[in-house]
């Protein structure tokens, strides 16, 4: 991946230009890759390590996005910074293609700056139907699931585009703070994530 193709999450959040990787560029890098887009630009990140299901995806400038079952559970090196997000109880995100409409999720967020710790947020999931989604040069028919977040100053929607066969989240838009969301697109998934759930 060339230097011009890899930009950090920090750049994405601070208004640097977007990055549009090609299928050939992604294929040339042996590591799993995601594209993360903030309010004003994008970054390509590679999978660095996995610890008990928590994946750490790194940019060239060492900004990090942490995912678990495709859900953003932390960021590092950007502002705002999601220091931690935990789900209370069982996570529906491991098999999002099988959820019942109206399923609720209890979340707890720790966000910097301003030491916003322990923010309790309820997510309500709704199945919106199948949609065609373009990723690189492929078109996929994916199940669109919306999660409406409310509580503790939050009023945002998360969106997930999920493989209807195995529940893998190919694309999502997820809040990392009450006023900031990231778009995450799987360019070259970690192969074990594609197994049936």
Task: Provide a role label for each language-model segment.
Residues 1-83, 99-197:
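Acidic, serine/threonine-rich low-complexity disordered tracts
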Residues 88:
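Active-site acidic/histidine clusters and adjacent loop/turn architecture
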């Amino acid at each position: 991946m060339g230097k011009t193709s890899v930009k950090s999450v920090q750049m994405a959040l601070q208004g640097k230009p977007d990055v549009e990787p090609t299928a050939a560029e992604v294929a040339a890098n042996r590591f799993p890759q995601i594209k993360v887009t903030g309010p004003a630009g994008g970054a390509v990140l590679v999978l660095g390590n996995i610890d008990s299901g928590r994946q750490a995806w790194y940019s060239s400038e060492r900004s990090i996005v942490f995912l678990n079952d495709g859900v953003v559970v932390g960021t590092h090196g950007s502002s705002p910074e999601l220091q931690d997000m935990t789900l209370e109880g069982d996570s529906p995100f491991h098999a999002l293609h099988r959820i019942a409409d109206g399923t609720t999720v209890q979340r707890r967020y720790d966000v910097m700056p301003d030491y916003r710790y322990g923010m309790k947020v309820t997510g309500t999931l709704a199945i919106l139907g199948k949609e065609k989604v373009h990723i690189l040069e492929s078109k996929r028919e994916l199940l669109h699931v919306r999660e409406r977040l409310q509580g503790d100053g939050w009023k945002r929607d998360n969106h997930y585009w999920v493989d209807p066969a195995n529940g893998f989240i190919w694309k999502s838009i997820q809040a990392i703070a009450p006023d900031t969301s990231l778009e995450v697109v799987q360019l070259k998934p970690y192969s074990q994530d594609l197994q049936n759930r």
